[in-house]
Amino acid sequence: MEEEKYLPELMAEKDSLDPSFVHASRLLAEEIEKFQGSDGKKEDEEKKYLDVISNKNIKLSERVLIPVKQYPKFNFVGKLLGPRGNSLKRLQEETGAKMSILGKGSMRDKAKEEELRKSGEAKYAHLSDELHVLIEVFAPPGEAYSRMSHALEEIKKFLVPDYNDEIRQEQLRELSYLNGSEDSGRGRGIRGRGIRIAPTAPSRGRGGAIPPPPPPGRGVLTPRGSTVTRGALPVPPVARGVPTPRARGAPTVPGYRAPPPPAHEAYEEYGYDDGYGGEYDDQTYETYDNSYATQTQSVPEYYDYGHGVSEDAYDSYAPEEWATTRSSLKAPPQRSARGGYREHPYGRY
């Protein structure tokens, strides 16, 4: 116990001694070196043999000098600790070694440090030494030396007096994040730059999300969902930048034959002139399918004797009147394969 107190007392007395007492200072320095040398010899005798067969844990310790004398204006302690001490904690986790910043200048409060140094307690004896980093490893021999080597290589990066190196930049970003400035800056930065999200509200029909409205025009029809109606080919999904599919009555695939035109009353019923009017939206797919099936079956009924349709009724379906009535829509192709319209055999009676 007396030997443990002896060295701190010598160091405290040396620091408190006036520089004018040259010989006294020299004698104290020699005594301190002698005492430290004896401790080093005892440690060397204990470490004379290394047992690697039993693989017992050994303790390694090294003191790494911090170059404060060469670079007195650089804050090495702050760089080693990092924001809230996180840099030193991560360094210990990565290397598996215990690291402590000791020596003169290791405490922030200089008055408190001087008071503890003069107290003469053994645990504060390091305050009389030079500023250094104590690295301690407790592991099996092979792993212990490997950890120590790794720790020495990593601690060397923190002792470079560079304000703009990668370690310093990372610490500044971490400090900004901890202070909350990064979150507030990110909130201001995205104002007016957000990504527009398409509406996901379901439409009134059977389809999914409401597609973006096409340019205003007459006869433009947007598919309402993915259900395929009778007599029509499947409609591919509408993507951004792709033209809106054409209205009913125009072929969507080359070679597709358009169905015969419906009666004029059908256009008034579905409200094609109003574009996206309420009359069209209220119609369901069943109503559309029934009307479409009716108009496709009306071709063979032209020659049914029970109807007694006059010749004027056939003239109202002429292609010329179709084109003039609906000039905004594309006229269907001429059906030359059927040979045109024939007169009713009993129309003269």
From Swiss-Prot:
Domain KH residue range list: 65-135
UniProt-annotated stretches for the region Disordered: 182-284, 319-349
Compositionally biased tracts (Basic and acidic residues): 340-349
GO CC term, one of those recorded: nucleus
Tissues where this protein is expressed: Highly expressed in brain, lung, kidney and small intestine. Weakly expressed in placenta, liver, spleen, thymus, ovary and colon.
UniProt modified residues of type Omega-N-methylarginine: 230, 240
One Pfam family linked to the record: KH-I_KHDC4-BBP
CDD domains named among the record's database cross-references: KH-I_KHDRBS2
Keywords linked to the UniProt accession: Methylation, mRNA processing, Nucleus, Phosphoprotein, RNA-binding, SH3-binding, Transcription, Transcription regulation
GO terms assigned for molecular function: mRNA binding; poly(A) binding; poly(U) RNA binding; SH2 domain binding; SH3 domain binding
GO term, biological process aspect, one: mRNA processing
PTM notes: Methylated. Tyrosine phosphorylated by FYN, PTK6 and SRC. Tyrosine phosphorylated by SRC during mitosis.
Cell location: Nucleus
UniProt-listed InterPro entries: BBP-like, KH_1_KHDC4/BBP-like, KH_dom, KH_dom_type_1_sf, Qua1_dom, Sam68-YY
Highest taxon of the lineage: Eukaryota
Subunit and partners: Self-associates to form homooligomers. Interacts with KHDRBS1/SAM68; heterooligomer formation of KHDRBS family proteins may modulate RNA substrate specificity. Interacts with RBMX. Interacts with SAFB, SFRS9 and YTHDC1. Interacts with FYN and PLCG1 (via SH3 domain). Interacts (phosphorylated) with FYN, GRB2, PLCG1 and RASA1 (via SH2 domain).
Family: Belongs to the KHDRBS family.
PANTHER family the UniProt entry points to: KH DOMAIN-CONTAINING, RNA-BINDING, SIGNAL TRANSDUCTION-ASSOCIATED PROTEIN 2, RNA-BINDING PROTEIN RELATED
Function: RNA-binding protein that plays a role in the regulation of alternative splicing and influences mRNA splice site selection and exon inclusion. Binds both poly(A) and poly(U) homopolymers. Phosphorylation by PTK6 inhibits its RNA-binding ability. Induces an increased concentration-dependent incorporation of exon in CD44 pre-mRNA by direct binding to purine-rich exonic enhancer.
Name used for this protein in its record: KH domain-containing, RNA-binding, signal transduction-associated protein 2
Source organism: Homo sapiens (Human)
Organism taxonomic ancestry: Eukaryota, Metazoa, Chordata, Craniata, Vertebrata
